[in-house]
Amino acid sequence: MARWRVIDTGANDGAYNMAVDQVLAQGVAKSPVLRFYDWDPPAVSCGYGQRFEREVDSAVCSALGIDIVRRPTGGRAVLHWEELTYSVVCDPRDLNGGGEGVEGAHRTIA
């Protein structure tokens, strides 16, 4: 199994957080990476293909000081507020130690 890098980038705005995830996902990471981060200010991150203008009220977000950003990955809108977020970038073979599927990935990371 490859040696994992653990990165804590602290609290940053949504654009910075998504830019780091994008760079890591584009293969800049030569070894598996587990990244921890926080959001300051709070943000709504929308999935890559999501039409968020239908589901996220940008006027309310603006009034509350909540950023709206797009994730480089799929999924739905997620509100990030007073939380610790993590991302994993690796070759799927780096997760085999914990077993198959999402549960196996969580066991490997833990």
Question: What function would you assign to each model-found segment?
Answer:
Residues 8, 96-100:
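Short coil/turn segments at secondary-structure junctions
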Residues 1-55, 59, 63, 67-71:
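Active-site loop/lid in soluble adenylation, ligation, and acyl-transfer enzymes
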Residues 54-97:
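A glycine-rich, hydrophobic loop/mini-helix early in the fold
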Residues 101-110:
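Long, well-ordered alpha-helical scaffolding segments within enzyme catalytic domains
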Residues 13, 100-101:
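Alpha-helix capping and helix-coil boundary motifs
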Residues 16, 20, 82, 109:
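Catalytic-loop motifs flanking and including active-site residues across diverse enzymes
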